[in-house]
């Protein structure tokens, strides 16, 4: 049986932690940040843990847990 292919779009956006959770970047940080206050920008810095409902679908796109 051939190797399964990784969906590269998902591999660029998600990482799987050692415990199996999904990490992803927070949206809304590219441009037009003057309309947001400093608290919003500070809290959305870094990464976030993904929703449990989306885990199965995204893990299917990442068969080797990139």
From Swiss-Prot:
One of its GO terms (cellular component) is cytosolic large ribosomal subunit. It comes from the Bacteria. Keywords: Ribonucleoprotein, Ribosomal protein. One of its GO terms (molecular function) is structural constituent of ribosome. The keyword Ligase does not apply. GO terms for biological process: translation. InterPro entries: Ribosomal_bL35, Ribosomal_bL35-like, Ribosomal_bL35_CS, Ribosomal_bL35_sf. Gene3D superfamilies: 4.10.410.60. Signal peptide: none annotated. The keyword Cell wall biogenesis/degradation does not apply. Belongs to the bacterial ribosomal protein bL35 family. This is Large ribosomal subunit protein bL35. It comes from Hyphomonas neptunium (strain ATCC 15444). The gene is rpmI.
């Amino acid at each position: 049986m051939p190797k399964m292919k990784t969906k590269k779009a998902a591999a660029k956006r998600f990482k799987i932690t050692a415990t199996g959770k999904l990490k992803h970047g927070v949206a809304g940080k590219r441009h037009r940040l003057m309309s947001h206050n400093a608290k919003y920008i500070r809290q959305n810095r870094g990464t976030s843990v993904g929703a449990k409902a989306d885990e199965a679908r995204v893990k299917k796109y990442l068969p080797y847990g990139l």
